Amino acid sequence: MKKLKIVTVVGTRPEIIRLACVIKKLDQYCEHILIHTGQNFDYELNEIFFADLGIRKPDYFLGAAGSNSAETIGNVIIEVDKVLKEVNPEAMLVLGDTNSCLGILPAKRRKIPTFHMEAGNRCFDQRVPEEINRRLVDHMADINLTYSSIARDYLLNEGLPPDMVIKTGSPIFEVINTYMDDINSSDILKKMNLTKHQFFVASIHREENVDSDKNFLNIIESLNAVAKVYKFPVIVSTHPRTQKRIDSLKVKLDPLIKILKPLGFLDYNKLQVSAKVTLSDSGSINEESSILKFPALNLREAHERPEGMEEAVVIMTGLCKERIMQSLAIIDNQSDGNQKLLRQVYDYSMPNVSDKVVRIVHSYTDYVNRVVWKKY
């Protein structure tokens, strides 16, 4: 029996993590070609997550990372198109809002049905590079798969046809639950000589936070204040962009701030669930905090997860030291009972997103060929 041939394009750590279960299901039910653009080329940002999650190696590694974003985007489009010409797939799947997702453009030019997971997220802040990518990819994709009802409504309000926008829920719940035993078994606390709830975790990587001197120095000042006031270690999982800024600006860090290379999925989540509070500018912190029930601050001035804020699963602090310290005080005072264990976001509790995606791809590939491309 001939299986449907589909390509999946990834390029960054969040895409690898979120697609962990989907990749395995597509391998099972499809002729599946996995493409890694090489947008993140550091070992710690790539292979460590393939190993942690038991994901096979990509069929193609494109090495598309350039000296700037324009060069990277150009390389992604050119190199993905070469693979599409070679393998001639029946469908393409992308997830998220990174430059790697722009590999959808050559697929559209080749009239290949395209599916976009994590569609419809909006932060309405054009300073965020991913916001531009989201809007482009959402409006190029044939079928948009949203995490939440709010994201679906955004796309409908932008004029996309209702039959082409499907809410699947977030895939991260399935991923976390699949690997929960491994997360619990991590010995990272022992290795680092940490005591549960007596340390902080921090992750800072967003372009708008790191590449701005003012924003980055505000964050460093805040982390120093956290270490000084609480006298607990602050464990920073450091993106290469962040490390370069630390080095170039010669910032002074409190001795309690520990700068580490990027941690794997299992160890990092073990730290998050064990920390006093996680401070992060990650787009996924709302989901992780809601699912794993740990307190978190979102160090951003805009976000694309309003469904998370409806349940107040995190506090969005901006980059002001005073607001960050006030928010930590709120978490301290709400540390017991129902005030801490806020209700889990419904759209973040879907147990079978990988199965949904397989069914949707098989349901809509021929539909897109017929309705969009008039092939039949």
Regions found by a protein language model. Give the residues of each.
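Nucleotide-activated sugar donor-binding and catalytic core shared by glycosyltransferases
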Residues: 1-232, 237, 242-376
